[in-house]
Amino acid sequence: MTSAELKHLLDEAEKSPRQIAAAVSGLPEKILRYQPAPGKWSILEILAHLVDIEILYAYRMRQMLADKNPTIAPIDQDDWARNLGYLESVPAELVALYGLNRHYNLRLLRRLTPEDLEKSAFHPERQARVTVADYVGMLSGHGSNHLAQIERLKKEAR
């Protein structure tokens, strides 16, 4: 990954918390809790997921940067949504936590060297190694993917 590619991905990642905050600002509970089908996430669950995955990515990237030959522990994001109280969350807190965690991750990522970006961990679900650079790419696109999902849910719920 070139320094220009890294800068572009991090600049995109920086926009996400503001975009998510704007998309959910002032939404009534009915829309925040609307589920398009059984087992499909509401906007509230998406917000909680964004926070948890930001924390998860933070941990995984730090493992790669600091530990010797780490292995990533897989998760089931639907189990997390069901078992971690996503529907009992406070939307404004989730928006704030997402922004703060993203900010903290970006502070770390902006000071990495090209060698740091190639540090890796074994991902058992993929049966392959993944790098910090791979996670930068995932982090950069994660919020925008869910922003599109939030916009669709807002239209469906009205």
Residue ranges and their predicted role:
Residues 23, 27-30, 68, 112-115, ...:
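A short secondary-structure junction motif
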Residues 5, 12, 38, 42, ...:
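Alpha-helix N-cap/loop-to-helix boundary motif
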Residues 2-29, 51-59, 63, 137-141:
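Alpha-helical bundle segments that constitute or directly flank the non-heme di-iron/ferroxidase center
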Residues 4-11, 35, 67, 88-89, ...:
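Solvent-exposed interaction patches of small proteins and small membrane subunits
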Residues 12-18, 23, 81-118, 139:
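Acidic/histidine-rich alpha-helical segments that form the ligand environment
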Residues 33-77, 106, 118-158:
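Short, contiguous alpha-helical
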Residues 1, 78-86, 122-125:
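A short small-residue
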Residues 8-11, 23-26, 68-71, 83-87, ...:
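Short acidic/polar alpha-helix capping motifs at helix-coil junctions
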